[in-house]
Amino acid sequence: MNPKFKNNIGIMVPEILMPAKNVDLTKWACVACDQYTSQPDYWNKCEEIVGDAPSTLRLMLPEIYLEKPGETEKIAAIRKAMHDYIDNGILQNLGEGFVFTRRSVGGNTRNGLVVALDLECYDYSKGSTTLIRATEGTIVERIPPRLKVREGACLELPH
Protein backbone atom coordinates (compact mmCIF):
# COMPACT_ATOMS: atom_id res chain seq x y z
CA MET A 1 0.00 0.00 0.00
CA ASN A 2 1.39 3.35 -0.97
CA PRO A 3 1.73 5.54 2.16
CA LYS A 4 0.98 8.68 0.11
CA PHE A 5 -2.67 7.58 0.09
CA LYS A 6 -2.90 7.22 3.89
CA ASN A 7 -5.74 9.32 5.32
CA ASN A 8 -8.02 9.62 8.33
CA ILE A 9 -11.11 7.99 6.79
CA GLY A 10 -9.85 4.41 6.88
CA ILE A 11 -9.79 3.89 3.12
CA MET A 12 -6.67 3.54 1.00
CA VAL A 13 -6.02 3.06 -2.70
CA PRO A 14 -5.18 -0.60 -3.34
CA GLU A 15 -2.82 -2.13 -5.84
CA ILE A 16 -5.10 -4.09 -8.16
CA LEU A 17 -4.19 -7.58 -9.37
CA MET A 18 -6.52 -9.28 -11.83
CA PRO A 19 -6.38 -12.69 -13.52
CA ALA A 20 -4.72 -12.75 -16.95
CA LYS A 21 -6.97 -12.79 -20.03
CA ASN A 22 -6.33 -16.50 -20.63
CA VAL A 23 -7.59 -17.54 -17.17
CA ASP A 24 -10.95 -19.36 -17.18
CA LEU A 25 -13.06 -17.10 -14.96
CA THR A 26 -15.64 -19.84 -14.37
CA LYS A 27 -12.92 -21.70 -12.47
CA TRP A 28 -11.21 -18.60 -11.09
CA ALA A 29 -14.12 -17.27 -9.04
CA CYS A 30 -14.87 -18.72 -5.62
CA VAL A 31 -17.13 -17.80 -2.70
CA ALA A 32 -15.65 -16.39 0.51
CA CYS A 33 -13.75 -18.69 2.85
CA ASP A 34 -16.36 -18.37 5.61
CA GLN A 35 -19.22 -19.76 3.50
CA TYR A 36 -20.47 -23.37 3.54
CA THR A 37 -18.49 -24.08 6.71
CA SER A 38 -20.51 -27.20 7.51
CA GLN A 39 -20.84 -28.53 3.97
CA PRO A 40 -17.75 -30.49 2.91
CA ASP A 41 -19.56 -31.69 -0.22
CA TYR A 42 -19.72 -28.10 -1.48
CA TRP A 43 -15.95 -27.65 -1.17
CA ASN A 44 -15.26 -31.11 -2.63
CA LYS A 45 -17.36 -30.14 -5.67
CA CYS A 46 -15.36 -26.89 -5.98
CA GLU A 47 -12.13 -28.90 -6.01
CA GLU A 48 -13.58 -31.17 -8.69
CA ILE A 49 -14.69 -28.25 -10.88
CA VAL A 50 -11.42 -26.32 -10.55
CA GLY A 51 -9.08 -29.28 -10.99
CA ASP A 52 -5.58 -27.94 -11.77
CA ALA A 53 -6.81 -24.63 -13.21
CA PRO A 54 -5.78 -21.32 -11.62
CA SER A 55 -8.42 -20.33 -9.07
CA THR A 56 -8.95 -18.15 -6.03
CA LEU A 57 -9.74 -21.48 -4.37
CA ARG A 58 -5.95 -21.94 -4.29
CA LEU A 59 -5.41 -18.55 -2.64
CA MET A 60 -7.55 -18.99 0.47
CA LEU A 61 -8.34 -21.59 3.10
CA PRO A 62 -12.03 -22.42 3.37
CA GLU A 63 -12.90 -22.29 7.06
CA ILE A 64 -14.24 -25.83 6.94
CA TYR A 65 -10.54 -26.86 6.99
CA LEU A 66 -9.49 -24.66 9.93
CA GLU A 67 -7.71 -26.57 12.68
CA LYS A 68 -8.13 -29.86 10.84
CA PRO A 69 -5.43 -32.34 9.77
CA GLY A 70 -3.49 -31.01 6.80
CA GLU A 71 -4.07 -27.34 7.66
CA THR A 72 -0.34 -26.53 7.77
CA GLU A 73 0.23 -28.13 4.36
CA LYS A 74 -2.77 -26.29 2.89
CA ILE A 75 -1.43 -22.95 4.17
CA ALA A 76 2.00 -23.66 2.66
CA ALA A 77 0.30 -24.50 -0.66
CA ILE A 78 -1.65 -21.22 -0.53
CA ARG A 79 1.53 -19.19 -0.05
CA LYS A 80 3.21 -21.07 -2.90
CA ALA A 81 0.21 -20.51 -5.20
CA MET A 82 0.28 -16.78 -4.43
CA HIS A 83 3.92 -16.55 -5.49
CA ASP A 84 3.37 -18.79 -8.52
CA TYR A 85 0.41 -16.74 -9.74
CA ILE A 86 2.46 -13.54 -9.54
CA ASP A 87 5.69 -15.02 -10.93
CA ASN A 88 3.97 -16.82 -13.83
CA GLY A 89 1.72 -13.96 -14.92
CA ILE A 90 -1.53 -15.58 -13.83
CA LEU A 91 -2.17 -12.40 -11.85
CA GLN A 92 -1.58 -9.15 -13.72
CA ASN A 93 -0.73 -5.99 -11.79
CA LEU A 94 -2.96 -3.15 -12.98
CA GLY A 95 -1.37 -0.64 -10.60
CA GLU A 96 -3.02 1.47 -7.94
CA GLY A 97 -6.70 2.23 -8.31
CA PHE A 98 -10.21 1.18 -7.48
CA VAL A 99 -12.52 -1.39 -9.05
CA PHE A 100 -16.17 -0.52 -9.59
CA THR A 101 -18.47 -3.51 -9.28
CA ARG A 102 -22.09 -4.05 -10.27
CA ARG A 103 -24.12 -7.16 -9.61
CA SER A 104 -27.75 -8.05 -9.96
CA VAL A 105 -29.52 -10.37 -7.57
CA GLY A 106 -33.24 -11.01 -7.62
CA GLY A 107 -33.88 -8.08 -9.95
CA ASN A 108 -32.00 -5.60 -7.76
CA THR A 109 -28.70 -4.05 -8.80
CA ARG A 110 -25.97 -3.38 -6.26
CA ASN A 111 -22.98 -1.18 -7.01
CA GLY A 112 -19.74 -1.40 -5.09
CA LEU A 113 -16.18 -0.19 -4.97
CA VAL A 114 -13.16 -2.34 -4.13
CA VAL A 115 -10.91 -0.33 -1.80
CA ALA A 116 -8.22 -1.11 0.75
CA LEU A 117 -9.26 -0.68 4.35
CA ASP A 118 -6.88 0.58 7.02
CA LEU A 119 -7.20 -2.13 9.64
CA GLU A 120 -6.04 0.36 12.29
CA CYS A 121 -9.55 1.86 11.87
CA TYR A 122 -11.30 -1.54 12.25
CA ASP A 123 -12.91 -3.12 15.27
CA TYR A 124 -15.05 -6.26 15.15
CA SER A 125 -16.39 -5.85 18.69
CA LYS A 126 -20.16 -5.64 19.11
CA GLY A 127 -21.24 -2.01 19.51
CA SER A 128 -18.02 -0.66 18.01
CA THR A 129 -18.12 2.91 16.72
CA THR A 130 -14.86 2.85 14.77
CA LEU A 131 -14.84 3.98 11.14
CA ILE A 132 -14.73 0.35 9.98
CA ARG A 133 -16.63 -2.35 11.84
CA ALA A 134 -18.07 -5.79 11.30
CA THR A 135 -21.51 -6.04 9.72
CA GLU A 136 -22.12 -9.42 11.31
CA GLY A 137 -20.91 -11.21 14.42
CA THR A 138 -17.25 -12.22 14.47
CA ILE A 139 -16.38 -15.68 15.72
CA VAL A 140 -13.36 -14.75 17.84
CA GLU A 141 -12.07 -18.34 17.93
CA ARG A 142 -11.53 -18.20 14.16
CA ILE A 143 -9.21 -15.20 14.29
CA PRO A 144 -5.98 -17.05 15.28
CA PRO A 145 -6.27 -19.68 12.51
CA ARG A 146 -7.14 -16.95 9.98
CA LEU A 147 -4.02 -15.07 11.04
CA LYS A 148 -1.94 -18.18 10.39
CA VAL A 149 -3.06 -18.05 6.77
CA ARG A 150 -2.16 -14.35 6.45
CA GLU A 151 1.27 -14.61 8.10
CA GLY A 152 3.87 -14.61 5.36
CA ALA A 153 1.25 -14.28 2.61
CA CYS A 154 2.30 -12.00 -0.26
CA LEU A 155 -1.32 -11.14 -1.18
CA GLU A 156 -4.39 -9.82 0.60
CA LEU A 157 -7.66 -10.84 -1.01
CA PRO A 158 -10.97 -8.97 -0.92
CA HIS A 159 -13.71 -10.74 0.94
Functional labels for PLM-detected ranges:
Residues 1-159:
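A cross-family signal for N-terminal binding/gating loops and helix N-caps
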